Swiss-Prot record:
Residue stretches spanning the membrane: 20-39, 66-86, 97-117, 139-159, 241-261, 304-324, 349-369, 390-410, 448-468, 476-496
Topological category with respect to the lipid bilayer: Multi-pass membrane protein
Pfam families according to UniProt: NhaB
Name of protein: Na(+)/H(+) antiporter NhaB
HAMAP family named among the record's database cross-references: NhaB
Gene: nhaB
Cross-referenced PANTHER family: NA(+)_H(+) ANTIPORTER NHAB, TRANSPORTER ARSB-RELATED
Localisation per UniProt entry: Cell inner membrane
A cellular component annotation (GO) from this entry: plasma membrane
Amino acid sequence: MPVTMSRAFLDNFLGNSPKWFKIAIISFLVINPIVFYFNPFVAGWLLVVEFIFTLAMALKCYPLQPGGLLAIEAVAIGMTSPSQVLHEIEANLEVVLLLVFMVAGIYFMKQLLLFVFTKMITKVRSKIYVSLLFCISSAFLSAFLDALTVIAVIITVAVGFYSIYHKVASGKTFGESHDHTSDGYPQLCEEELESFRGFLRNLLMHAGVGTALGGVCTMVGEPQNLIIAAQANWQFAEFAIRMSPVTVPVFFAGITTCFLVEKFKVFGYGQQLPDAVHKILSDYDAHEDANRTKHDKVKLLIQAVIGVWLIAGLALHLASVGLIGLSVIILATAFNGITNEHALGKAFEEALPFTALLAVFFAIVAVIIDQQLFAPVIQWALSYEGNTQLVIFYIANGLLSMVSDNVFVGTVYINEVKSALLNGQITRDQFDLLAVAINTGTNLPSVATPNGQAAFLFLLTSAIAPLIRLSYGRMVWMALPYTIVLSIVGVLAIQLGALEQMTQYFYDSQMLIHHSAQAAADGVVSSH
């Protein structure tokens, strides 16, 4: 039967995506202008829900195409303007540079990372200890690096482990070329492969949550932390001290949760590393040690020195994250002899599709701003006072961060609270407490879904996700125990008065000083 033009069009539209998904996207594109004509506010929330749907279906179709079509239509029908979209991208330029340069920079440090984490996996046989190591090390790194950078590190390590095992299990030697994305090798043991996938899923989720545990603690841990610190005129040490009444108990609760889910093997955790896989990784480690030349050792040393620069540069905020990432690329390639353009290009393959997706997301953010979708929630939260207001802001931030980008949510709320301060609705001390509630509210409950945490979304849409069968639903399920524990411990630290009491203690012991409203007015308004 000959293929008609209409059939060919439908076949080409969104490629190999399921037919029902194609029909759903077309339906959205037809419905949205009609709803917008009658009620722009409802149409705005409908668009947000539809975009979240495209993210949820990331393994059926990469969200850039369906989400991008929705965003283009939103601009075309007047839900927002091209200038507003450009403004959002400009305001978040540091995040864009982070994705373009920092993630690529980590690519050139993967030899060192694979060396360190391979030792960790091969030398520590207890799954519980390995899980705790991954969670704690991710938290530590995230206190100095952006969570996206840390998750890029862990993804690099996981892909390295997976490709090594897949190559050897397929009957090849370490040095041979191999396509680890194909399972069409008869030598592969399906049960063994599934167990290894489960093991890697566990480690990636523990590491992902670790980035949230560490990222909330310091002003460089997450992009929105920088925004909040700038608005409040806080420096690195003051930010960490002010957050500590909430972040310290939450950190220990998170580590305890990591131990418990592994111990009792619930929520998809407790997957063991098969002995055969451990032997392959151990053999690879021994093979690498035996064949490591002086040139290789110098490369590892150079990468270690660059790693020190990376942490120091970010901790001291010597330059923007993206520019430090660019310096990592230049230093790592120059001193390790990588001068071929094709070799350089490979480093950017992982991050650029996600960077384009993030730009589409900023278009959705522009709609949220222009249609004032969060305005009712903000006014409701400001109607409360005192400690109750802190709890309400924490919960309101948490709920919105579960479905929307936490950088955007944090930016919107801190700007609204700052306006309330400058208008005399709240005191400066209350503003400082609210800033803590906003920061912890955007960072902690947002681990619930990949929509809130950019690092989680990056993981979901990365090359490793389909290899280890990490879907949106599975991610939400595995994050659930962490979501419950972190959210509850965080809200209790505020509700029971620990935040107010400890902050007062810090004032009394002169670890903190009282700021004036004018100091906040002098803060730099930013949204990156």
